[in-house]
């Protein structure tokens, strides 16, 4: 029998003051807890009151992590009852503070696996040790080179994997005993960390090239061998590594990169929701991306695939896309184009004034986009002039300033709504309160990846899918984009975070059905909805 102290220290089985008198007797816990036996809801209410006494968001997050480290059921029950309030604290943006201060704040490893680039021989044993006999179905891994908007944070980025898994569980209901957070410590190029005596990771510059990719390959092989029904989620890798890794494994295993695919899927869902409101077709739209990095190009790729799915040829679809970066409109003769940008760069010969298209305003005037999406982190770049220009040639311009945090957004939703006389269909990267405009409350959809990746992954896991295909991704986007209320003035293009659990199930069912339809399920499934519901974990004792 497990010794009593170990039971109280194991967050998977600890109930704290909710252990009954009979359980306390049986498990040897008599005298180790206060006399009162609490119901789970009593614990939740008490813990929430303690949470409310904390002042800063960082203090609140550290408190919640103490609960997580102690009692998973209590943590997730509390989180599920306060999703809207807790999401920005458990995850983005507050998680950035704990990542930047991880070494100074370090208390315990939170069940994560720490892989050292210099010790590939330890990959298998590390994963085994961290899993501790659990049946791992979902693994979130990061090398933390491109964390959120804050860059390279080395081993401290493990927090992003831990936080991501928390969202998976509260949104979709993945059992926390079947997930594992992994960080690959490949060094860091962050000088602040390299000079910090308290930094807990490897103190050398990032390893690149064959040694790095060989390590990744060994990791994938060991993970697949140890956990045969695995869904592998890559998080916050650097730009070049992210796409190389995804391209290497997406046709071999069920795998997903949130930075490349997640933002693309949720923006596609938002665009589909906007088009449902306006009654227009995607294949009639002209798309402009302001920002052509990992996120921007991930969105372009997703919408391009959807246009092809809707009947355009590959080349026809490409003509609907235009990229604007810091140097202006990107042209096909630019020697610095990335492999992702090259297929979508404009032909210089198509523009008489090509040399003058060196900023967003000029590009908008030349191209006349009907959809404008910002991932540039250049604040206030969607100007009144641009919004009014778009509103002049398209009835319902789709404008998504999704850079975050708020101070980096390309425009404020309220301004875009006002400048377009209420015509713009808006998505943002941060939560926005309802906006009163001409007697109506306009709801603003948040293009938050958390709307999509939990249901997407859960559906693939429920179907025991061998791969995550473009068709499954498209099914996810359509299921989310189909939730909008087209009868209501000011309806949001995406559903609210408050309904996260409900529509995560909708997404999961759509994805699982598509996997079964494509014959990708490892085991026969007669009833997809039942398979999804049977997998769902509820936080209860």
UniProtKB/Swiss-Prot annotation:
Question: What name does the UniProt record give this protein?
Answer: Malolactic enzyme
GO term, biological process aspect, one: malate metabolic process
Q: How does activity depend on temperature?
A: Optimum temperature is between 37 and 45 degrees Celsius.
List, alphabetically, the PANTHER family matched.
MALIC ENZYME-RELATED, NAD-DEPENDENT MALIC ENZYME, MITOCHONDRIAL
Pfam families attached to this UniProt entry: malic, Malic_M
Spell out the reaction equation it catalyses. Answer: (S)-malate + H(+) = (S)-lactate + CO2
Record field: pH dependence: Optimum pH is between 5 and 6.
Q: Under the GO molecular function aspect, what terms does this record hold?
A: carboxy-lyase activity; malic enzyme activity; malolactic enzyme activity; manganese ion binding; NAD binding; oxidoreductase activity, acting on the CH-OH group of donors, NAD or NADP as acceptor
- Binding positions for NAD(+)? 292-295, 404, 449
Q: Which family does it belong to?
A: Belongs to the malic enzymes family.
Which InterPro entries did the record assign?
Aminoacid_DH-like_N_sf, Malic_enzyme_CS, Malic_N_dom, Malic_N_dom_sf, Malic_NAD-bd, Malic_OxRdtase, Malolactic_enz, NAD(P)-bd_dom_sf
Identify the EC number(s).
4.1.1.101
NCBIfam families named among the record's database cross-references: malolactic (NF041582), PRK13529.1 (NF010052)
General function of this protein: Involved in the malolactic fermentation (MLF) of wine, which results in a natural decrease in acidity and favorable changes in wine flavors. Catalyzes the decarboxylation of L-malate to L-lactate. It can also use pyruvate as substrate.
Active-site feature positions: 91 (proton donor), 164 (proton acceptor)
Class of enzymatic activity (EC top level) = lyase
UniProt keyword terms in alphabetical order: Lyase, Manganese, Metal-binding, NAD
- List the cofactors: Mn(2+); NAD(+)
SMART domains (alphabetical)? malic (SM01274), Malic_M (SM00919)
- Activity regulation here? L-lactate and ethanol are non-competitive inhibitors, whereas succinate, citrate, and D-tartrate show competitive type inhibitions.
User: Record's Gene Ontology CC terms?
Assistant: cytosol
Binding residues for Mn(2+): 235-236, 259
The annotated subunit structure for this chain is: Homodimer.
Q: What residues does substrate bind to?
A: 164, 449
């Amino acid at each position: 029998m497990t010794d009593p102290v170990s039971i109280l220290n194991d967050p998977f089985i600890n109930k704290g003051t909710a252990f009954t008198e009979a359980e306390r007797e049986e498990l040897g816990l008599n005298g180790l807890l206060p006399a009162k036996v609490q119901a789970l809801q009593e614990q939740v209410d008490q813990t929430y009151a303690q949470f409310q006494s904390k002042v800063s968001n960082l203090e609140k997050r550290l408190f919640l992590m103490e609960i997580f480290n102690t009692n998973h059921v209590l943590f997730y029950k509390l989180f599920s009852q306060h999703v809207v309030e807790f999401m920005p604290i458990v995850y983005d943006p507050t998680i950035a503070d704990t990542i930047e201060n991880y070494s100074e704040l370090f208390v315990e490893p939170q069940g994560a696996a720490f892989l050292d680039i210099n010790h590939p021989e330890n990959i298998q044993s590390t994963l085994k040790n961290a899993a501790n006999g659990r049946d791992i179905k979902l693994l979130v891994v990061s090398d933390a080179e491109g964390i959120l908007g804050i860059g390279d944070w080395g081993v401290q980025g493990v927090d992003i994997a831990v936080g991501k898994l928390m969202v998976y569980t509260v949104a979709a209901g993945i059992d926390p005993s079947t997930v594992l957070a992994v960080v690959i410590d490949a060094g860091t190029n962050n000088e602040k960390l390299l000079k910090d005596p308290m930094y807990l990771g490897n103190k050398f510059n990032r390893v690149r090239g064959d040694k790095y990719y060989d390590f990744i390959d060994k990791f994938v092989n060991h993970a697949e061998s140890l956990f045969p029904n695995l869904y592998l989620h890559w998080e916050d890798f650097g730009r070049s590594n992210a796409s190389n890794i995804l391209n290497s494994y997406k046709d071999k295993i069920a795998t997903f990169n949130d930075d490349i695919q997640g933002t693309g899927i949720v923006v596609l869902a938002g665009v589909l929701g906007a088009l449902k409101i306006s009654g227009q077709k995607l294949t009639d739209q002209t798309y402009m991306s302001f920002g052509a990095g990992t996120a921007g190009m991930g969105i372009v790729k997703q919408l391009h695939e959807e246009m092809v799915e809707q009947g355009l040829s590959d080349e026809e679809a490409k003509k609907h896309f235009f990229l604007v970066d810091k140097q202006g409109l990107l042209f096909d003769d630019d020697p610095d184009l990335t492999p992702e940008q090259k297929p979508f760069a404009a032909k210089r010969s198509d523009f008489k004034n090509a040399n003058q298209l060196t900023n967003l305003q000029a590009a908008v005037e030349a191209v006349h986009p009907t959809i404008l999406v910002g991932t540039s982190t250049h604040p206030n770049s969607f100007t009144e002039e641009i919004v009014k220009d778009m509103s002049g040639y398209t009835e319902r311009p789709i404008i998504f300033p999704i850079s975050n945090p708020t101070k980096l957004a390309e425009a404020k939703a309220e301004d875009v709504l006002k400048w377009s006389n209420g015509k713009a269909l808006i998505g943002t990267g941060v939560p926005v309160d309802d906006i009163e405009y001409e007697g109506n409350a306009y709801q603003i959809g948040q293009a938050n990846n958390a709307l999509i990746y939990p249901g997407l992954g859960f559906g693939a896991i429920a179907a025991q899918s061998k791969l995550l295909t473009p068709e499954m991704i498209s099914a996810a986007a359509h299921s989310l984009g189909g939730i909008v209320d087209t009868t209501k003035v000011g309806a949001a293009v995406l559903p609210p975070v408050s309904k996260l659990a409900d529509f995560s199930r909708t997404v999961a069912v759509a994805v699982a059905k598509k996997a079964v339809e494509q014959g990708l399920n490892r085991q026969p499934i007669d009833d997809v909805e039942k398979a999804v519901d049977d997998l769902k974990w509820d936080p209860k004792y």
